[in-house]
Amino acid sequence: MTRIKINARRIFSLLIPFFFFTSVHAEQTAAPAKPVTVEAKNETFAPQHHDQYLSWKATSEQSERVDALAEDPRLVILWAGYPFSRDYNKPRGHAFAVTDVRETLRTGAPKNAEDGPLPMACWSCKSPDVARLIQKDGEDGYFHGKWARGGPEIVNNLGCADCHNTASPEFAKGKPELTLSRPYAARAMEAIGKPFEKAGRFDQQSMVCGQCHVEYYFDGKNKAVKFPWDDGMKVENMEQYYDKIAFSDWTNSLSKTPMLKAQHPEYETWTAGIHGKNNVTCIDCHMPKVQNAEGKLYTDHKIGNPFDNFAQTCANCHTQDKAALQKVVAERKQSINDLKIKVEDQLVHAHFEAKAALDAGATEAEMKPIQDDIRHAQWRWDLAIASHGIHMHAPEEGLRMLGTAMDKAADARTKLARLLATKGITHEIQIPDISTKEKAQQAIGLNMEQIKAEKQDFIKTVIPQWEEQARKNGLLSQ
């Protein structure tokens, strides 16, 4: 027995230097960093994909800014305490992706790379530079830190390398070679049984759009992007998932409710609608095949309204004329908008009534079931309206979600009336004048003059520094 112990000790003593040497040697000869093959400068690919590039560049014509808060000031109250109450414009062309996220009041006016209200994740759907940085630094390296850290790096507008494997021989030959450039999107597709590599061509066409046109949240300390699809893709499934992990995007400053903010869930709503169920893809409607001057077919990258290309989009499947289909879509849009406004009115009252209950001394336990109803009502409303095309993608699902939102909001207000009565408040809670965006912002205590002044200073001083640094580093062509 003693001999065995001695031999074991001798063997161990001989192995220690070996392990030490091997460990040190491994550190010294670590595999080189993976080469960065993502080229973010979109103009690089103009020679091979000339027509596609020019049509993509034409998204700069989609330049109109539409102020959604001015159109509907109720939104300011629903998002009280959240950056969306400051500024929310309807989407413009892809050519404005970087400009719009830089200039929105939501991203604040950071003075340095560690300053500002938002995380790096807020760049994730804006630029092929995101794919480049993820390849270069890994996901943890990319997501780490504040949004301002990415300013000098994320400078090219949403484009080629977001959807295509631009480093592949196939792409160099003029073929599409689609890819999921965001690893978190690939994981989400796998979670719902749709691994990209095994998907058919039609599925892949919509999946690349679904990297960004989708609901997501910021997870963990690094605020990494994750899709909440673990329990399914319907509004109730995602609501259940968020409740299970006790996630909230922010706390409404009036009702003190932990809230959820839907993003832009076009992939989910398209999947639930008649087009998705019949494998009519995003590309079929928004990026149809068109002819160039020589008669050659190519995919139009000026992503837009299908009615603008009726003969190449809707008319491929529908026998009705353009006017007839536009009438149907307009009626659906009006129905959804009418119910949307009714839900918003209920939620506005619920937030102010909840504030009155809290001011009257309502306890956390008394407020919990009410706040749950407000949270769920607004989540369902938001998922329906955040997808700007739901009247086309899934009108029935949109109306269903808004209907359940109305029920939840009514439940909250019924409970609030009972609770307020126990506090001696039986009169109607007065709502301040929120008839304009400015009045609504004043009602929730926003100092918009200061916020706008700080942003203008940021635009004039910080953004030029970012662009100068990007040019020095070869990240911008001009």
Swiss-Prot record:
EC numbers: 1.7.2.2
What is the official name of this protein in its record? Cytochrome c-552
Look up the record and name the cofactor or cofactors this protein needs: Ca(2+); heme c
Q: Which gene encodes it?
A: nrfA
Q: Which NCBIfam families does this UniProt record tie to the protein?
A: cyto_c552_HCOOH, PRK11125.1
Identify the residues that bind heme c 3.
94, 209, 212-213
Family that this chain belongs to: Belongs to the cytochrome c-552 family.
- Entry's localization field: Periplasm
Q: What class of enzyme is it?
A: oxidoreductase
| Pathway(s) of this molecule | Nitrogen metabolism; nitrate reduction (assimilation)
**Keyword check for ATP-binding:** no
